[in-house]
């Protein structure tokens, strides 16, 4: 706008355009509408970018205000033209020359070019040295380097001597080119150019074309002269010209304030006094030595400041400032040592007090009297009054107010898909010092010259506001440049000052204050909102200060007011004319200069006449007209995805045609799908041409679907590929909670495997008999055998249990249970089939079946009824034995009949002994017996195993406790029992176990870590003493008919049947997937059995484990590697039907398994200390083996998979070898005789090494012998694994599938977490690849990202999983037979079970007691107390030996916890015997949390680790809230909200389970991981397709045959190879089942990656010149270079017209790297736990690491972007990396070491660097034909050092570490803004301090703060040595 008011105005005529008075209504131009989208002009681009465009186009002189932009322009120009200088110098290659004025500037330029490009740079600064060089020497230099940076003198010498001719230079850069006007080498160099035919491109850089005052004519002349000398056009940057043509110019007003009339004479008097005092000090004749400080300095300063305030603001302010200065002086006086200095200070102090006294005579300082202020101040207040907002504008206001700070805040998240970034509470509380939300219409700055003026003026305005209601709306503050300067050294005091200033700016930005009084520092560099009022209180003295203060008035309607005293006004008018002239000159030079006047003169065009609008629907539809089109285009560009540094804008070029008309060409940013430039028709003027082309553009954008039907940009949500998502409709349920979240839980029936449904045998129908084989494979190690008990291997006795059913049971893997004797391996083998039984037999069997569950195991309870015919799962469990001396097992009918007859079967037999018929002791009766004391507990008698017969004790022996003399006396006194036989021996007994959950070892927690135990000595002493044993008298006990050996096996039944159930369910799922997805076979070959189920960790190690290797002559060598502590060739003992072990010539029925370990011939015994870490099942001793071993490069044994060594591998027999040879670490192939496998190569097609755990990988421990034949004496029913099978062809091991179905809450030995993480990353990869490659060629990254997150969302996966029927199959709660076990043949009795239905809310993770630990503990105590009355102290009561020893506190703590949190509504009676009273009610507190538990006072000493299951850090929660919750199995966990008041679900524990939606989604991912590890990537993709996630293209049946995917061929051919006719049949069935109507093809690589473009190839060559060096560096050559270019092209790089920008490749690469790294970590032989995996993955897959690696491998030198901010951030980051030169972990401690610890500044990590690291991975993937291997070959070498460093020492994010360390007392503040636009976060660790962190986003700042807190906490911790 032309300034309407340049003439001085008297106040009456002062017409300010204030927002309130503006015709557009009061809400136009609100300051918080920050980044307004321009409607009438294209969004301006950064001035550096404009200048670069100009420089590329012609010779240019760049005039900038500061040095900052110069390097950017020079370096980018060099890079853009670098294709001209890469050639060989001797073959017409050119060179780029930088000229600088002085030697010290050379280094600076060199480092800039080296940092940002890979060009070779030569530096020449010393004229003396280089003057002596010969032409040859120079020639070498020119050949070696491509960019030459030299001082002007060196250059002149080189050119003059003809060593280098100008025609060999492609670009000549002059730094500080204004010097060329003088007589300077620059000028001479330019003279040489005059005669040169092909002159180089010239770039002149100058920042000092304007210095101080300057005459416009001179300036113009200077610029013209410079242009002439340098043959260039001068271009100025917009920072020298106010906002060029883009924004409306402010209205400029000069106000004549009139003279000051001093009626009271006070002003004159004060002025005189001050002058005198100043003169006096100046006259003092004090000699000042140069070293010393001037004593008068402070005094002079203070007095002259005071005088200035008086003159500018008047007496009232002078009085105020005098008061402030007195306070300031006091401080100085107190600290001043030197007498003379002190005297001056005291003099000044007195003088200021005098001033104050004078003022007090005239006015009271308390209130403001306007008679005593200058006219300037009065005018200022008048202006401010005009901005007073109107009252009561109610419309919209509050919303406006609330939304106001949207734009002033940083974009919080670094990128769109960072879901984890916390939402920030953005609404700041408005300060209370202004009355209404409308106050903020003013947004103004008053510029003053001196610091004190600012301070006092602020005081004055505040005072005026109190007195004048018109000014009450003002909320002002001042800011002085003190301490803001970037590079000043800062001390504590400055720091505080700095903080204060920052706070002031923050408030101004947030519009909490609306007026800022500032010194000139705010003119430049500080981030301030657009103001609508700028007042120059002191007139600008030079052009720069005029422009910069004016530049602050950027709001659409703004005023720039200059206040002038009458006497100054004349001279200022002159100045102002000068400034205007200078501005005009510079504006003509501005690279976008268009005459600004045009805007006002041009009327609003009636667009329809000129050019018809684009209308969607004729009547009322949205329309784009000529006048609105540009706004639409700007808005569209602003919505394209981009990083925080780049604001994408359209580029419009307008050219004049010969006939005087104009046409425009519009280019959109390169990541818009509309790639072609749009050319508009010729129009009469420039403005119209620009508008018309925008209109055409809108039409095109709408037609390709980029603008929606309201003509607004299409968001990523309204994707036009919705059909791709085919999201199913959300099922209608009444279940509260968001679908897919943890909060939403639903009930599902528990699955029952088909083969066990209704399979109860019927008379006369054929039956199947299965034997439950049990072999003790790992005896309990001594240090865990506290009572020194004898171990009872189950295979020592022949009688065992079997299963009788009417349907066949598929083969399932063997699995372990953990008894008191150690690990027992269970097998289910078919004994006979097709036989029938009579009704009597079946009735007997049925009665015994019920007897086992009701009496032996006591699992019958009122809620359960035995109804074998109605039960869902019904089959019989019955005893088997060797019948009639034959060696085969059969049903033991005789035994069953004996039991029926026995008196002791149910109750206690009433035997009477008397003196006449005394009790006779027979030893053999007690050798394998269970006994029942006959004198107590008649309703539920206790049962004991006889552990030992003490023949040396009799009832007359001494009783262990002093109260009784002898045992006989004790029984007489206590029970009144007389013994008839006084020399019978006594019995040492053990409880029969009531722990029925034997799935995991007693002494390990679920992660396989040993629980803490009390010291062995203590324990040993305890068990040695008689006091702690239970001693019974045989005469007083009855013998139970069930022998102890069988009883011990019966105790295992619930666990065995439960595991059997689960594995069959998993097997069923495997078969179902085989038919749905075509992965694996529907039914397994009969002779195949999967490897054993295993936990991946193993028992704490036996101190004397032996690693024995069988002698090579041993008949049996079916060795397998099993995850056991003992690496043994477990000779065929374990494959036998009844696990018989034909060892050499032994023929006995049962060989004690231990003989295998210690007596095999030729054994190698290695003592192994207990400190073993089970790696992959091959235990190694840390002292023997330094390092970790990578066995055959794969963890092949996850899951106890018997790894059969197939015959394809020849192994040399060797008998002994040092243990180091067991492992092969660095993957070097060993000599062939020590066969180890190399990964990734399939061996002969059949023996597949799997990609990772889950399938038998054939790997042999060197030294095991391998003969392929089955040993001759193996019976037919034993299985020999046949060579053709592997999980790859048959489908995953059911054990692994079970792992994928088991949640961590089930507290089993395995859970789905590791698999889930692998599946999660593969899923992301699969979805990404398909969305990019096959289907969507033109969607940009934001949309792709949105689609991906929709598909992989928990909500979607949950629906798919539910459709697939997973919830019923999942294992969600801990197995606890008394609580949730349903024995076979039982049904839940609906009437009685109501008492048992648990309200879901009360359900504590399916009840902790379930652990089977607590009830035991209680039961034990109760009993022992009875029997061992002689104990001295009750505290010693110790529970059953397999229970850990908890001291009373633990138990009390747990009680408190359970009772306090009302853990169970249904009380499980603490003694499992009183099965009747199962309905106590414990009520539940509303919300159980740590706070509300009534802990015992000694809670602090409670050792968490020992109660592993009870209190645990629950990582699953951390994901969601970033907070760790110490989870007590508290009810609110399992519920959908007691607190939320939603309905509770009640459900039956035996037949139903309650699962959170998210767990189902996790399970889907884990199953995917399971298929991926077992059957490979193709299988995993097919599995996803079968779920309904289309990750492969569908082929119609017809063309199926032609396009069979090679991988599918493999599947099928492998099927064909199955040996034998059966296999062929199953192969055929397989094909039939697979080839349904759908076939899936393979993903194709998208056909094009370059756009059709006439010059495409040439452009490509130019753009990637020099990239061959990069290809060498990463060791990969691109076949299609366009991918390479695309990977490095940033969205701002508009010179690339032939490919897309890197965003889509980055989206792909991100998923690929995430998957490859996760897979690598998953397969690490160290078998990281889920928590560690998560930490490692987030430490390695993050932007910081990727960016650091990108810089390390020079990615940044090839990066193509045109973005000044990004340029500087990368520059900083690279410098920082060079200094640090050491990569760090998580968040990589990227901070500059600042001495002042006050705030921690995290260095900015440029996201773009991490992005190109990812995009290159995507490019290699595409270029190599979608080969993940290729990508990993390139990336693994780069990442390996980090992977190894972190795996050895897992980093955690500082925020998480802090929250884990101090979860209760850590509080993070919301974000605050700092003065330069960054974010500050404060973390308070209550009681330990507050710590601040600063960064560009909330997340960075938060982690910086957390890191400082951690450093401080760790420093103050007492150092505890790591135990």
Swiss-Prot record:
Acidic residues: compositionally biased ranges: 414-425
Organism for this UniProt entry: Bos taurus (Bovine)
Motif (DECH box): 175-178
Region Required for interaction with PRKRA and TARBP2, residue ranges: 256-595
Site residues (Important for activity), renumbered to this chain: 1807
Gene expressing this chain: DICER1
Binding site for ATP: 64-71
Phosphoserine: residues bearing it: 413, 415, 1015, 1160, 1461, 1469, 1471, 1869
Subunit structure: Component of the RISC loading complex (RLC), or micro-RNA (miRNA) loading complex (miRLC), which is composed of DICER1, AGO2 and TARBP2; DICER1 and TARBP2 are required to process precursor miRNAs (pre-miRNAs) to mature miRNAs and then load them onto AGO2. Note that the trimeric RLC/miRLC is also referred to as RISC. Interacts with DHX9, AGO1, PIWIL1 and PRKRA. Interacts with AGO2, TARBP2, EIF6, MOV10 and RPL7A (60S ribosome subunit); they form a large RNA-induced silencing complex (RISC). Interacts with BCDIN3D.
Disulfide bonds: none
Reactions that this protein is recorded to catalyse: Endonucleolytic cleavage to 5'-phosphomonoester
Molecular functions per Gene Ontology: ATP binding; deoxyribonuclease I activity; helicase activity; metal ion binding; ribonuclease III activity; RNA binding
Protein family per UniProt: Belongs to the helicase family. Dicer subfamily.
Binding-site list for Mg(2+) 2: 1706, 1811, 1814
Cofactor note: Binds 2 magnesium or manganese ions per subunit.
The protein's name: Endoribonuclease Dicer
Residue ranges annotated for the Dicer dsRNA-binding fold domain, each copy included: 629-721
Gene3D superfamilies: 3.30.160.20, Dicer dimerisation domain, P-loop containing nucleotide triphosphate hydrolases, paz domain, Ribonuclease III domain
Domain Helicase ATP-binding stretches: 51-227
Lineage of producing organism: Eukaryota, Metazoa, Chordata, Craniata, Vertebrata
Region entry Disordered, spans: 410-433, 1246-1291
Residues the record lists as binding Mg(2+) 1: 1316, 1396, 1399
Biased amino acid composition, Polar residues: 1246-1255, 1277-1290
Domain DRBM: 1853-1915
Domain Helicase C-terminal: 433-602
InterPro entries xref list: DEAD/DEAH_box_helicase_dom, Dicer_dimer_sf, Dicer_dimerisation_dom, DICER_DSRM, Dicer_PBD, Dicer_platform, dsRBD_dom, Helicase_ATP-bd
PROSITE patterns: DICER_DSRBF, DS_RBD, HELICASE_ATP_BIND_1, HELICASE_CTER, PAZ, RNASE_3_1, RNASE_3_2
Domain RNase III: from-to ranges: 1276-1404, 1667-1825
């Amino acid at each position: 706008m032309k300034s309407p008011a340049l003439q001085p105005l008297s106040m009456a005529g002062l017409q300010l355009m204030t927002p309130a008075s503006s015709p557009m209504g009061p809400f136009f131009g609100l300051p918080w509408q920050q980044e307004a989208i321009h409607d009438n002009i294209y969004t301006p681009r950064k001035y550096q970018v404009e200048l670069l465009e100009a420089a590329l186009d012609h010779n240019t002189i760049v005039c900038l205000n500061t040095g900052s932009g110069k390097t950017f322009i020079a370096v980018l120009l060099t890079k853009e033209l670098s294709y001209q200088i890469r050639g060989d110098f001797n073959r017409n290659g050119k060179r780029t020359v930088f000229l600088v004025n002085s030697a010290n500037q050379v280094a600076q330029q060199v480092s800039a070019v080296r940092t940002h490009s890979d060009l070779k740079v030569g530096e020449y600064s010393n004229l003396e040295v280089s003057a002596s060089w010969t032409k040859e020497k120079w020639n070498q230099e020119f050949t070696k380097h491509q960019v030459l940076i030299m001082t002007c003198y060196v250059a002149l010498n080189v050119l003059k001597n003809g060593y280098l001719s100008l025609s060999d230079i492609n670009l000549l850069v002059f730094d500080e080119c204004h010097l060329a006007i003088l007589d300077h080498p620059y000028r001479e160099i330019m003279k040489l150019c005059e005669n040169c035919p092909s002159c180089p491109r010239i770039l002149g850089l100058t920042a000092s074309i304007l210095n101080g005052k300057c005459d416009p004519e001179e300036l113009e002349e200077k610029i013209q002269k410079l242009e002439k000398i340098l043959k260039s056009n001068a271009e100025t940057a917009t920072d020298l010209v106010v906002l060029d043509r883009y924004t409306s110019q402010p209205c400029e007003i000069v106000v004549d304030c009139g003279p000051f009339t001093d009626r009271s004479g006070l002003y004159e008097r004060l002025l005189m006094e001050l002058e005198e005092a100043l003169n006096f000090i100046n006259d003092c004749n004090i000699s000042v030595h140069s070293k010393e400080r001037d004593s008068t300095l402070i005094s002079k300063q203070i007095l002259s400041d005071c005088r200035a305030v008086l003159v500018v603001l008047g007496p009232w302010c002078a009085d105020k400032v005098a008061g402030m200065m007195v306070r300031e002086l006091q401080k100085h006086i107190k600290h001043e040592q030197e007498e003379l200095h002190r005297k001056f200070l005291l003099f000044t102090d007195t003088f200021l007090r005098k001033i104050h006294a004078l003022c007090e005579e005239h006015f009271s300082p308390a209130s403001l009297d306007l008679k005593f202020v200058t006219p300037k101040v009065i005018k200022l207040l008048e202006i401010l009054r005009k901005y007073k907002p109107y009252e009561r504008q109610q419309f919209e206001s509050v919303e406006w107010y609330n939304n106001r700070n949207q734009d002033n805040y940083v974009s919080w998240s670094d990128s769109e898909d960072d879901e984890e970034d916390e939402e920030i509470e953005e609404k700041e509380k408005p300060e209370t010092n202004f009355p209404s939300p409308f106050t903020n219409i003013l947004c103004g700055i008053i510029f003053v010259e001196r610091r004190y003026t600012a301070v006092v003026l602020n005081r004055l305005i505040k005072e005026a506001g109190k007195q004048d209601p018109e000014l009450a709306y003002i909320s002002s503050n001042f800011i002085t440049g003190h301490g803001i300067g970037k590079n000043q050294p800062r001390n504590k005091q400055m720091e505080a000052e700095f903080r204060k200033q920052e706070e002031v700016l923050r408030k101004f930005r947030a519009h909490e204050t609306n007026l800022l009084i500032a010194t000139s520092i705010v003119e430049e560099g500080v981030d301030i909102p657009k103001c609508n009022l700028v007042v120059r209180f002191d007139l600008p003295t030079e052009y720069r200060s005029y422009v910069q203060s004016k530049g602050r008035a950027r709001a659409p309607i703004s005023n720039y007011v200059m206040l002038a005293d009458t006497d100054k006004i004349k001279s200022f008018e002159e100045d102002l004319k000068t400034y205007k002239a200078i501005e005009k000159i510079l504006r003509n030079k501005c690279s976008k200069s268009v005459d600004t006047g045009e805007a006002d003169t041009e009327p609003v065009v009636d667009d329809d006449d000129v050019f018809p609008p684009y209308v969607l629907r004729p009547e009322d539809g949205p329309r784009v007209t000529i006048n609105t089109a540009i706004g639409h285009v700007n808005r569209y560009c602003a919505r394209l995805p981009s990083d925080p540094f780049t604001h994408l804008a359209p580029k419009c070029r307008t050219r004049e045609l010969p006939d005087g008309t104009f046409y425009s060409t519009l280019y959109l940013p390169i990541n818009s799908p509309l790639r072609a430039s749009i050319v508009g028709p010729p129009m009469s003027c420039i403005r119209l041409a620009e508008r018309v082309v925008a209109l055409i553009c809108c039409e095109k954008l709408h037609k390709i679907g980029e603008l929606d039907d309201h003509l607004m940009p299409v968001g990523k949500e309204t994707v036009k590929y919705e059909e791709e998502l085919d999201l199913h409709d959300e099922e209608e349920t009444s279940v509260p909670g968001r679908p897919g979240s943890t909060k939403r839980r639903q009930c599902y029936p528990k699955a029952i495997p088909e083969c066990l449904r209704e399979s109860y045998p019927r008379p006369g129908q054929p039956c199947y008999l299965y034997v439950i084989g049990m072999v003790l494979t790992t005896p309990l190690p001594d240090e865990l055998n506290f009572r020194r008990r004898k171990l009872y291997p189950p295979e020592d006795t022949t009688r065992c249990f079997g299963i009788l059913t009417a349907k066949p049971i598929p083969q399932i893997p063997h699995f372990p249970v953990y008894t008191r004797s150690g690990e027992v391996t269970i097998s289910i083998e078919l004994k006979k089939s097709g036989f029938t039984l009579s009704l009597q037999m079946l009735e007997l069997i049925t009665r015994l079946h019920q007897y086992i569950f009701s009496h032996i195991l006591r699992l019958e309870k009122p809620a359960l009824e035995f109804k074998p015919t109605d039960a869902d799962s019904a089959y019989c469990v019955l005893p088997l034995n060797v019948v009639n001396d034959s060696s085969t097992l059969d049903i033991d009918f005789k035994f069953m009949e004996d039991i029926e007859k026995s008196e002791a079967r149910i109750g206690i037999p009433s035997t009477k002994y008397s003196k006449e018929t005394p009790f006779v002791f027979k030893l053999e009766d007690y050798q394998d017996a269970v006994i029942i004391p006959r004198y107590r507990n008649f309703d539920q008698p206790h049962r004991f195993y006889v552990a030992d017969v003490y023949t040396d004790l009799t009832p007359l022996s001494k009783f262990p406790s002093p109260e009784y003399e002898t045992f006989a006396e004790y029984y007489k006194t206590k029970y009144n029992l007389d013994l008839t036989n006084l020399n019978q021996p006594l019995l040492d007994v053990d409880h029969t176990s009531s722990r029925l959950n034997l799935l995991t070892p007693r002494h390990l927690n679920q992660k396989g870590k040993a629980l803490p135990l009390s010291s062995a000595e203590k324990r040993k002493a305890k068990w040695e003493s008689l006091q702690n044993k239970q001693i019974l008298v045989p005469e007083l006990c009855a013998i139970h008919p069930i022998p102890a050996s069988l009883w011990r096996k019966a105790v295992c039944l619930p666990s065995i049947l439960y595991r059997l159930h689960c594995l069959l369910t998993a097997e069923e799922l495997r078969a179902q997937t085989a038919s749905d997805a075509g992965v694996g076979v529907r039914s397994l070959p009969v002779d195949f059995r999967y490897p054993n189920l295993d936990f991946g960790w193993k028992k704490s190690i036996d101190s004397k484990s032996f690693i024995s290797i069988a002698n090579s002559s041993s008949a049996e060598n079916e060795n397998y590697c099993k995850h056991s502590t003992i690496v043994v060739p477990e000779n065929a003992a374990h494959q036998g039907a009844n696990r018989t072990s034909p060892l050499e010539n032994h023929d006995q029925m049962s060989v004690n398994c231990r003989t295998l370990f210690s007596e095999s011939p030729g054994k190698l015994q290695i003592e192994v200390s207990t400190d073993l870490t089970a790696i992959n099942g091959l235990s190694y001793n840390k002292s023997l083996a330094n390092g970790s071993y990578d066995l055959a490069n794969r963890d092949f044994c996850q899951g106890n998979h018997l790894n059969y060594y197939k015959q394809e591998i020849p192994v040399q027999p060797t008998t002994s070898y040092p243990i180091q040879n067991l492992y092969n670490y660095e993957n070097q192939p060993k000599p062939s005789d020590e066969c180890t496998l190399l990964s990734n190569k399939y061996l002969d097609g059949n023996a597949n090494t799997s990609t990772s755990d889950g399938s038998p990988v054939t790997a042999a421990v060197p030294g095991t012998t391998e003969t392929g034949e089955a040993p001759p004496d193996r019976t037919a029913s034993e299985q020999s694994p046949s060579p053709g099978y592997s999980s790859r062809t048959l489908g995953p091991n059911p054990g692994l599938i079970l792992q994928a179905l088991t949640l961590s809450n089930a507290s089993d030995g395995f859970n789905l977490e590791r698999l889930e993480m692998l599946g999660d990353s593969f899923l992301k990869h699969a979805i990404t690849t398909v969305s990019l490659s096959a289907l969507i060629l033109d969607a940009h990254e934001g949309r792709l990202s949105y689609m991906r997150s929709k598909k992989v969302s928990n909500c979607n996966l949950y629906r798919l999983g539910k459709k697939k029927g997973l919830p019923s199959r999942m294992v969600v709660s801990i197995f606890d037979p008394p609580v949730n076990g349903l024995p076979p043949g039982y049904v839940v009795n609906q009437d009685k079970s109501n008492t048992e239905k648990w309200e879901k809310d009360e359900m504590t993770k399916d009840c902790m007691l379930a652990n089977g630990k607590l009830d035991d503990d209680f039961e034990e105590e109760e009993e022992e107390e009875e029997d061992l009355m002689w104990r001295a102290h009750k505290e010693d009561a110790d529970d059953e030996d397999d229970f850990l020893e908890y001291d009373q506190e633990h138990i009390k703590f747990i009680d408190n916890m359970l009772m306090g949190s009302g853990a169970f509504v249904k009380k499980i009676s603490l003694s499992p015997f009183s099965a009747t009273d199962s309905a106590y009610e414990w009520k539940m507190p509303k919300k159980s949390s740590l706070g509300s538990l009534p802990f015992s006072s000694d809670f602090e000493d409670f050792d968490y680790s020992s109660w592993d299951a009870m209190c645990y850090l629950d990582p699953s929660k951390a994901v969601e809230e970033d907070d760790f919750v110490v989870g007590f199995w508290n009810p609110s966990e399992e519920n959908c909200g007691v607190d939320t008041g939603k309905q509770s679900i009640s459900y039956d524990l035996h037949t139903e389970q309650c699962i959170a939606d998210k767990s189902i989604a996790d399970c889907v991912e884990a199953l995917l991981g399971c298929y991926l590890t077992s059957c490979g990537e193709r299988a995993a993709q097919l599995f996803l397709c079968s779920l309904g996630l289309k990750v492969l293209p569908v082929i119609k049946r017809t063309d199926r045959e032609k396009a069979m995917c090679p991988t599918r061929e493999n599947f099928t051919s492998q099927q064909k190879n199955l040996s034998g006719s059966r296999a062929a049949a199953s192969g055929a069935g397989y094909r039939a089942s697979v080839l349904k109507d759908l076939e899936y093809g393979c993903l194709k690589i998208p056909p094009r990656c370059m756009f059709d473009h006439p010059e495409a190839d040439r452009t490509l060559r130019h753009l990637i010149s020099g990239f061959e060096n990069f290809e060498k560096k990463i060791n990969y050559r691109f076949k299609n270079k366009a991918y390479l270019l695309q990977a490095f092209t940033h969205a701002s790089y508009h010179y690339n017209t032939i490919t897309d920008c890197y965003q889509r490749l980055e989206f792909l690469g991100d998923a690929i790297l995430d998957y490859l790294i996760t897979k690598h970590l998953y397969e690490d032989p160290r078998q990281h736990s889920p928590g560690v995996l998560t930490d490692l993955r987030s430490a390695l897959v993050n932007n910081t690491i990727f960016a650091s690696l990108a810089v390390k491998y020079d990615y940044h030198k090839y990066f193509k972007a045109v973005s000044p901010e990004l340029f500087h951030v990368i520059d900083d980051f690279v410098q920082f990396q060079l200094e640090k030169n050491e990569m760090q972990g998580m968040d990589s401690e990227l901070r500059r070491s600042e001495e002042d610890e006050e705030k921690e500044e995290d260095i900015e990590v440029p996201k773009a660097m991490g992005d190109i690291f990812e995009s290159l991975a995507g490019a290699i993937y595409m270029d190599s034909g979608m080969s993940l291997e290729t990508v990993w070959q390139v990336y693994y070498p780069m990442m390996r050092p980090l992977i190894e460093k972190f795996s050895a020492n897992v980093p955690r994010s500082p925020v998480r570490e802090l929250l884990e360390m101090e979860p209760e007392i850590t509080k993070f503040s919301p974000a605050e803004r700092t003065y330069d636009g960054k974010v500050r976060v404060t973390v308070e660790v209550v009681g330990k301090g507050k710590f601040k962190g600063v960064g560009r986003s909330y997340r960075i700042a938060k982690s910086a703060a957390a890191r400082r807190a951690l450093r401080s906490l760790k420093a103050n911790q007492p150092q505890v040595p790591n135990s």
